[in-house]
């Protein structure tokens, strides 16, 4: 059984027991999170597709960790001007473990 849900403007395909990295959620470690915007649920041959969401379906997860991703560097380089600008960025994320899919 797996489901596709939306969080942080992105869609994620998950099954029970899977650990997923999402955009930062304002939840503490150990808290339970419910995602109601489930777009599709597949259970063997039974497929439920939402228009736009599946009514009554939700994905339940537990927050495992909060953290920051790898650093990316942004460089603006102007040739022949002896000028460059460098900036770094680390995106916050939340790791959740999927504990249940209810359809």
Swiss-Prot record:
It holds the Pfam family Ribosomal_L21p. PROSITE patterns: RIBOSOMAL_L21 (PS01169). One of its GO terms (cellular component) is ribonucleoprotein complex. The keyword Ribonucleoprotein applies. The keyword Calcium does not apply. One of its GO terms (molecular function) is structural constituent of ribosome. SUPFAM superfamilies: L21p-like (SSF141091). Keywords: Ribonucleoprotein, Ribosomal protein, RNA-binding, rRNA-binding. Transmembrane segments: none annotated. Belongs to the bacterial ribosomal protein bL21 family. Part of the 50S ribosomal subunit. Contacts protein L20. This protein binds to 23S rRNA in the presence of protein L20. This is Large ribosomal subunit protein bL21. It comes from Mannheimia succiniciproducens (strain KCTC 0769BP / MBEL55E).
